[in-house]
Design a protein with these regions (language model features):
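Primarily the internal scaffold of c-type cytochrome electron-transfer domains
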Residues: 1-221, 227-301, 307, 504
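Residue-level recognition of tetratricopeptide repeat
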Residues: 301, 340-342, 374-376, 410, ...
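Alpha-solenoid helical repeat scaffolds
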Residues: 306, 345-348, 376-382, 413-419, ...
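Structural marker of alpha-solenoid helical repeat scaffolds
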Residues: 338, 370-372, 406, 417, ...
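TPR/TPR-like (Sel1-like) alpha-helical repeat modules
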Residues: 401-408, 456, 466, 470-501
Length: 540
């Protein structure tokens, strides 16, 4: 179709499968009381019915059918084809609250390693005239079993609106609309910006041209993103400075709307599709002295710290974004101080990301000794990774075996089954492969066969899994199966992302689209008082 190679343009299923919501993911930050077995539980809930197809699905004695409104984020139907107000309200209510906003703290300075002051609430920091701050904002996905937004991420429009007022007068903003409904392109968008081979944006349902993503700002289920906003307080400021931040959703951006609903000749199309508020927060900071106000947050303080750290962790790593990883670690220490073992586990995640394996092992040991201890399956997963990195393959295998057999009574009672997580299956194959290399003769042959079986199980769940195909190629070479090895090498070439080809497309788009170039940076700071407004062709 694309005259290039196999590419996944949209993938709801793995997003759900590898999440905590499904009960199959081993590495989620949060887990629900009960696993959600499929999409229907959320999007097609049971409703009582006397329809001839009604059944007693849940054993309650009540006949029901699955609701075929298919609750989701299609808020454009009423405007476009005149569906009922009731159906629009059902969709609106379904997505409200799905992206929580938390104005968590400030940094006194212009970059991400400036001194942090927070969390905000119940008290607020006092700002000083003339200082520059970063407003640290957390976006947390709530009540969903897949990445937000998923679906048609080329045209779904989710953005963050920020309004800063000083005694009622606007002094900073982001995410505003122009008179035609186009969103300021320098805003933070919760989307994926996907490019064609020549560096043009995929924005006309031209999936056959998908080549590479410039960035992907979608947020996994039970995870968070941390967004930095820069603000300079006026030198003569006094009184109260108020920051209001909202996450907003519109089914189609203006560019896409104008394609299938073109404006009259000589006119600019106006995007009048409804905008739904997904989440919001507001804080009033005193200037110089006094007390501010903050909206009440019902979420516990440890969770707010945890979400702040998760957002930073997802950005952090080696090199340019190491500062985000350091801040994430500091946040997880706060979670520990507030009495939750999640802080130790997430600190271990950060240490693994930084390559500090001994520190990760220490954090996991602390998590296991904590009262109450961390989730045992989480300890086993990250413990196995640490042991494998240290060459302790037998210890890693013991943990992985407990995981793949879900030997945790609490997990089983909640409907969890980790045997379908391809990351776990690949890890089992990798460890068995490593153990086999230590053997000779029949012992090695048996070990290679065992490793082979685990990678084959991965392909049952995910036939395009590049890790499994690569290892199966190596295994079959050692086992003397040259033809099978060649076949898996071919699949690996077919499914592996083409890193060498992406640079030209990305470079072309970054040059042509300054706002997207900024949003694709390793560390992104959005200026709330930006003076220039270079807008690329084709407003959104």
């Amino acid at each position: 179709l694309n005259q290039y190679r196999f590419l996944r343009g949209q993938n709801h299923y793995d997003s759900w499968l590898l999440s905590g919501v499904s009960g199959h993911g081993v590495a989620s930050f949060y887990y629900p009381p009960k696993a959600q077995a499929n999409c229907n539980g959320c999007h097609m809930p049971l409703v009582p019915s006397t329809d001839f197809g009604a059944r007693d699905f849940d054993g309650s004695g009540v006949l029901s059918i699955h609701d075929h409104l298919f609750l989701g984020a299609n808020t454009a139907m009423r405007s476009m084809v005149g569906t009922t107000l009731e159906s629009f309200e059902a969709h609106r209510q379904f997505i409200e609250g799905s992206l929580r906003v938390d104005i968590f703290g400030i940094r006194r300075g212009e970059d991400v390693d400036a001194p942090f002051e927070g969390p905000i609430g119940p008290g607020t920091p006092t700002l000083q005239p003339g200082e520059t701050i970063l407003i640290e904002t957390v976006l947390r996905t709530m009540g969903m079993g897949h990445h937000f937004t998923q679906g048609t991420a080329d045209s779904n429009q989710v953005w963050v609106e920020v309004d800063v007022t000083l005694n009622g007068q606007t002094i900073g903003h982001s995410g505003s609309l122009d008179e035609t409904g186009v969103v300021d392109p320098w805003s933070h968008f919760v989307n994926a910006l996907v490019l064609s081979r020549d560096g043009s944006r995929i924005d006309q349902r031209n999936v056959e041209d998908i080549f590479v993503a410039l960035y992907n700002h979608q947020i996994p289920p039970g995870a968070a993103d941390t967004v930095h906003y820069r603000l300079s307080v006026p030198d003569d400021a006094s009184g109260m400075l108020t920051v209001k931040i909202r996450t907003l959703y519109r089914k189609f951006d203006t560019h896409f709307l104008n394609i299938f609903r073109p404006p009259e000749p000589g006119e600019s199309g106006v995007n009048d599709l409804p905008i739904v508020t997904l989440g919001e927060d507001e804080v009033s900071f005193p200037i110089g002295s006094g007390e501010g106000t903050v909206a009440q947050d019902e979420h516990p303080l440890w969770m707010r710290w945890n979400d702040y750290g998760i957002g930073l962790l997802r950005k952090g790593g080696m090199g340019a974004v190491r500062g985000e990883l350091v801040s994430a670690s500091e946040a997880f220490h706060k979670v520990v101080d507030l009495g939750h073992a999640d802080g130790h586990v997430n600190l271990a995640r950060a240490m693994i990301r930084a390559g500090r394996i001994d520190d990760a092992a220490s954090a996991l040991s602390d998590a296991g000794r904590h009262s109450p201890a961390a989730l045992p399956w989480t300890l086993d997963w990250f413990g196995a990774r640490v042991n494998r990195e240290n060459g302790h393959y037998q210890e890693a295998l013991e943990s992985l075996t407990r995981l793949v057999e879900t030997r945790y009574p609490d997990a089983r009672n909640r409907g969890f089954d980790f045997s379908r997580d391809v990351r776990l299956l690949n890890e089992l194959g990798t460890v068995h492969f490593a153990l086999a290399r230590r053997e000779v003769g029949e012992g090695q042959d048996a070990g290679l066969e065992e490793a082979n079986s685990w990678f084959q199980k991965t392909l049952v769940e995910d036939p395009e899994n590049v890790t499994a195909h690569w290892n199966l190629a190596q295994l079959n070479d050692l086992m003397g199966n040259a033809e099978v090895a060649s076949e898996h090498r071919g699949f690996h070439r077919k499914y592996k992302p083409d890193d060498s080809a992406r640079d030209q497309a990305i470079s072309a788009h970054r040059i042509a689209n300054p706002p997207a170039n900024h949003a694709a940076s390793d560390i992104v700071i959005y200026d709330l008082q930006r003076e220039t407004n270079s807008t690329p062709p084709g407003g959104r």
